[in-house]
Regions:
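Transmembrane alpha-helix boundary and packing residues in multipass membrane permease domains
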Residues: 10, 14, 22, 26, ...
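Helix-terminus/linker motif at the lipid-water interface of multi-pass membrane proteins
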Residues: 15-44, 48, 66, 104-114, ...
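Hydrophobic faces of transmembrane alpha-helices in multi-pass small-molecule transporters and flippases
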Residues: 1-23, 27, 48, 52, ...
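Short alpha-helical transmembrane segments in multi-pass integral membrane proteins
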Residues: 1-8, 64-131, 172-212
Length: 212
C-alpha cells in the first residue's frame, strides 16, 4: 500500500508531463522547422541551468526524509533556507550567461547561418532565465515534498504548471505570435511555485503527517 501511495501519483504525474510536452511540441511545430530548431537548442541550454538545482532538490529530499524519520521536523526550514541560498548562488552565473550572452550560447548549438533559429532561441532564454530564481525555490520545496512522502502534493503542484502553460501559450500566441509560447513558461512556474510553498508550509507545520 505504501509503495502504491508513492508510485501511483508519480506515474500519473509522469504521464501528464508526457502528454503536455507533446501538446507543447505540437504548438512549437506549427511555426516551422526553423523555429523548432531554435526551441530544441534553447531547451537543451535551459536544461543545463536546471541540473545543479535538481541535484540540490534531490539532496533536500534525502535531508527531509532523514529528519522526519528522526523526529526532527523543526530542522527542515533551516535546510530549506540553506538549499535556496545555494541554489541562488548556482543560478546567478546561468542567468547572467543566458540573459547577456544568449546569442553566443545559441551559437554553440546552431551554425552562424541559422539566424532565425538563433533569434528564436535567444528570445526564449531571455524570457525564462530571470525566472530561474523562482524555480530554485520550487525545486527546493519539491525536494521537501518528495522527502516527506507527500506525492499527492507533488502531483497537485506539477499538473497546474503544465496545464496552465499550454492554455496560456495558446492564448498568447494569438496576440504575440511565437513569442507567446515562451511567455507561457513564467505563468506556469509562478503557479507551481506558489502551490509548492503552500504545501511546504503544511508539511513544516505538521498539518501533513507521514507515517514512517
Amino acid at each position: 500500500r505504501r509503495i502504491a501511495k508513492v508510485g501511483v501519483p508519480s506515474m500519473l504525474q509522469q504521464s501528464i508531463v508526457s502528454v503536455s510536452m507533446m501538446m507543447m511540441q505540437g504548438l512549437v511545430n506549427s511555426y516551422g522547422k526553423v523555429f523548432v530548431a531554435g526551441y530544441t537548442a534553447a531547451t537543451k541550454i535551459d536544461t543545463l541551468a536546471m541540473l545543479p538545482n535538481m541535484n540540490f532538490s534531490n539532496a533536500m529530499s534525502s535531508y527531509t526524509a532523514q529528519n522526519l524519520g528522526a523526529g526532527k521536523r523543526e530542522r527542515i526550514p533551516l535546510g530549506f533556507k540553506t538549499g535556496v541560498r545555494l541554489s541562488f548562488y548556482a543560478t546567478i552565473p546561468f542567468f547572467l550567461l543566458y540573459f547577456v550572452f544568449s546569442r553566443q550560447m545559441m551559437g554553440l548549438f546552431l551554425g552562424a547561418g541559422s539566424t532565425r533559429a538563433i533569434e528564436s532561441g535567444m528570445e526564449f532564454l531571455r524570457i525564462v532565465s530571470p525566472m530561474y530564481f523562482m524555480i530554485s525555490i520550487k525545486l527546493m520545496t519539491d525536494g521537501i515534498i518528495r522527502g516527506s512522502g507527500a506525492m499527492t502534493y507533488f502531483v497537485l503542484a506539477t499538473v497546474p504548471d503544465l496545464i496552465l502553460r499550454i492554455i496560456v501559450a495558446n492564448i498568447l500566441t494569438g496576440r504575440f505570435g511565437s513569442t507567446g509560447i515562451w511567455m507561457a513558461w513564467p505563468f506556469g512556474w509562478i503557479a507551481a511555485t506558489l502551490l509548492t510553498v503552500i504545501f511546504y508550509r503544511r508539511i513544516v507545520s505538521g498539518k501533513f503527517r507521514i507515517r514512517i
